[in-house]
Amino acid sequence: MNKIHLTLVFLSLIGVVRAQTETAADTSLLQYVDPLVGSGGHGHVGVGANVPGGMVLAGPTLSGTGWDSTSGYHYSCNEIVGFAQMHLSGTGCSDLGDVALMPSMLPLELSREGLASTFSHDSEVARPGYYAVTLDRDLIRVEATATDRVALYRFTYPRGSDDAFVTIDLQNAVGDRLTRSRIFQVDDFTLCGFRHSHGWAADQQLWFCIRFNRPIHNFYSDGPSEPYARATFEVKAGEAVMAKVALSPTGEMGAMLNMRTEMPDWDFRAVRDEAARRWAAELSRIRAELPTRSQMRTFYTALYHTLFAPQLWNDVTGDYRGADGQTRYGAAWNNLTTWSLWDTYRALHPLYTLVMRDRMPDFINTLLSITQEQGELPVWHLTGNEIWCMVGCPAVPVLADLIVKGIVPPRQRASAFSAIAKSLMRDTRGLPYMWSHGYVPADVDEGESVSKSLEYSLAFGAAQQAASALGLKEDSAALQTGAQGYRKLFDADLNYMLPHQKDGSPKPMPDFNPCHQTADYTEGTPWQYAWLVPHDVQGLIGLYPTQQAFITRLDSLFLASAELNADANPDITGLIGQYAHGNEPGHHIPYLYNYVGQPWKTARLVRQIMSTLYTDKPDGLCGNEDVGQMSAWYILSALGLYQVEPAADRLQIGTPSVTRAELNVGEGRTFTIVSRNLTPRNIYVQQVKLNGRPWHEPYILYKDIIAGGTLEFVMGAKSGKMW
């Protein structure tokens, strides 16, 4: 014990400060963020205290266990089972909820049910970097704030006691199974241990250090490997016990060092205020003005939710546990996790390339390191684990986009393209058929062949764009079969993408119904997947006899009956006809009208989606937040922009909802968007000027945005015209 105590003292002398790009913080923007938006309905957002991109999301885990409780929190539930240090936000699957604390006045039964206490939403306070609630059982006030890797709690006890309790629960989390754990007392103030679990992440390994501001009066445990422990404290009425909980992916010593570096003191207000400042700085990357307070709340809460992940998965020293289970030491960059790429390549990552270019080196280094560790780019990474969730090669369009936009530095471009090539050439998940057939045959695959083929096809198309940007003509040509393979799935009679067999014939589908999900589609229907060719929209249009035939077909998507079969995937939500905004495969579809000279239809649909499927209430999202993708769609669309094509040099023009927005695009440059004559009726763009000159294209180039300047819209009620 003395050796460990001396180590703690030694570690307190070490300081490793995470490098950050300072942004002028406008703290007034915090008033527009409500962290409870999206915590009801199907939003699945996590609620608690964190900082942008931090490892910790410290807050309540509720007793609900259904699909809508994947984050550990759903607004319909009023029972807390513990305050855990990590939570997912917006995902369709459950995990995390690790290392939970629960204060009480008396010893509680050591079970999920025994620890639970009801609460009232009236007692909740949720702000960026801060969460508070009062437990009904003992009227204990619980407050939480955080740094990157450390949670800080303040438990205020209403009555005095010689034994005020804090129970540490390593048994229960959110949807996983405990495999190994340890908790032991280091000194009069400190507990350490680890929690290993199997869940969505098959081999999650997390270490922790808990330090209290008061000496532990009694410590109760049936042994270090038992998953529950109790610490008691002497308190007077109204006094607080504070607890720091530091996390590490590498070991207990890493957790201790993270605590000593990030939170050496006990000033709760200072930590809370610094968390708020960091949030304000990130939100200030876009200084937007919208017509109503409700729109301002929706906009800035959406921007807040885009900043949760990817999140840190390393120690302050740079040490981290890689995808191969090996610990790397002293990385000069921040290793990141929570890569929900099938969702986020569509809008979240394009948004990052506009206003968060300074964060991209960590993104690039992490993607390349994961490739070295597991042989390919990540598909869905959580706590350093590849969980293989969703279809396609979704990191390919992300990395290809960074190449095309010149964000990958010259010294890393060869390795970046090599990572793309390795990922597309894997002998798994049907990929070899993309090279030989251009699609994944339905009769040799385990399912979802259409969705897999289309996702692969757009990844091949994105890789082609990266190859072209790097002058790799032979590589670009070699990718052609996969990039154009979508054509082989198109049925010209039905106008759907249909599953095909290895011999090229359509798969027999005697009960085909385009409004119903089948085993050949991922979280969607034939209606919704008929348009998933964002890398070659003109090629998709060319599959129809005429451009007007394409327009008529696109119109019919939004006019069709919204009926779904009873066992439809719950992700198919937010329906306008058969367009499903509550899930990602269709997010680009409203912008396809730009490609056929009818941008006013894009404007009408985008405004309808924004005004009816997003609100500033707990049920304000029509589908899963999906780690920022749903919110990123809103942010870009509110700015009047959207990137349809993966790995593209342009963003499509839609209909701005901002009257003015200033984007910090980096290196001291600002890109300003101004909307004149904007009213609830004036939703159609009449004129566009770029830096004072008339602009007649339905898109704006990425290079013109990051160069800084002004994009001016003149809005009106008249539709049916180009600008």
Question: Which residue stretches match the model-derived regions?
Answer:
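Bacterial Sec-dependent N-terminal signal peptides
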Residues: 1-22
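Accessory carbohydrate-recognition regions in carbohydrate-active enzymes
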Residues: 21-397, 401-454, 462, 467-488, ...
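ATP-dependent phospho-/nucleotidyl transfer catalytic cores
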Residues: 459
